[in-house]
Curated annotation (Swiss-Prot):
Residues 223-265 are annotated as: Disordered. It comes from Vibrio vulnificus (strain YJ016). This is Large ribosomal subunit protein uL2. Belongs to the universal ribosomal protein uL2 family. The lineage of its organism: Bacteria, Pseudomonadati, Pseudomonadota, Gammaproteobacteria, Vibrionales. It comes from the Bacteria.
Length: 274
């Protein structure tokens, strides 16, 4: 893995910083694990924009990633590491002893030829998946299930991890990167180690077009809009908005709490760091 700063051969290359991984597969992905991935431009079934700043971008296939890791007791050999355009982490194509191939999130340090396993008897080794009741306290984990059998939901992006800090009855307590500590059922599964490609955060796209390739459209500031379009809009000449920052719908931003799921509050031991 190397961080490469491009030579300023043009204005669009001047600020580009790339993450280069020579270990990634340079050919086509494994076709049986590809699915159609249609774009919706941030619009719902009524054609209305529900998520702003989405549109365009390069065509992509979805890689079907195994987030459940339920093939217990069957060892799998890592065939290759691959780039995945749908996520910041890299993925690994693994071949199970029974002949089945699956994609998984590639943890830090994984290489082609490694052997991984899942189940209660799997050794404590990066890339192996176990129920959290079988993982030692203090271990670094990723791809954590919130609901047993549903599949991993936490710590899935590049460089992400959580730490298992306590075990209490049918629950374990984990500490997330944000500083939040929460309880999850100990029957849920997690994978040992942290997600690879942690250098992803160091990249610089270098130009607006690189964002457009990724399907990200520009963000227009509210203070340059008209009053009909945004609470900060209007005024004679350049203004500061005249009020505390709000969203286009008048909801305060910059630190305003919007969490409303009181049903799961009891599982949060400590709120995330500010």
């Amino acid at each position: 893995m190397a961080i490469v700063k491009c030579k300023p051969t043009s204005a669009g290359r001047r600020h580009v910083v790339k993450v280069v991984n020579a270990d990634l597969h340079k050919g086509k992905p494994y076709a049986p694990l590809l699915e159609k991935n249609s774009k919706n431009g941030g619009r719902n079934n009524n054609g209305r924009i529900t998520v702003r700043h989405i549109g365009g971008g390069h065509k992509q296939h979805y890689r079907v990633v195994d987030f459940k890791r339920t093939k217990d007791g069957i060892p799998a050999k890592v065939e290759r590491l691959e780039y995945d355009p749908n996520r910041s982490a890299n993925i690994a194509l693994v071949l199970y002893a029974d002949g089945e191939r699956r994609y998984i999130i590639a943890p830090k340090g994984m290489q082609a030829g490694d052997v991984i396993q899942s189940g209660v008897d799997a050794p404590i080794k990066a890339g192996n998946t176990l129920p959290m009741r079988n993982i030692p306290v203090g271990s670094t984990i990723h791809c954590v299930e919130l609901t047993p059998g549903k599949g991993a939901q936490l710590a899935r992006s590049a460089g992400a991890y959580a730490q298992l800090v306590a075990r209490d009855g049918s629950y374990v307590t984990i500490r997330l990167r944000s500083g939040e500590m929460r309880k999850v059922l100990s029957e849920g599964r997690a994978t040992i180690g942290e997600v690879g490609n942690s250098e992803h955060m160091l990249r610089e796209l270098g130009k607006a077009g690189a964002s457009r390739w990724r399907g990200v459209r520009p963000t227009v500031r509210g203070v340059v809009m008209n009053p009909v379009d945004h609470p900060h809009g209007g005024g004679e000449g350049r203004t500061s908005g005249g009020r505390h920052p709000v969203s286009p719908w008048g909801v305060p931003t910059k630190g305003y709490k919007t969490r409303s799921n009181k049903r799961t509050d009891k599982y949060i031991v400590r709120r995330r760091n500010k």
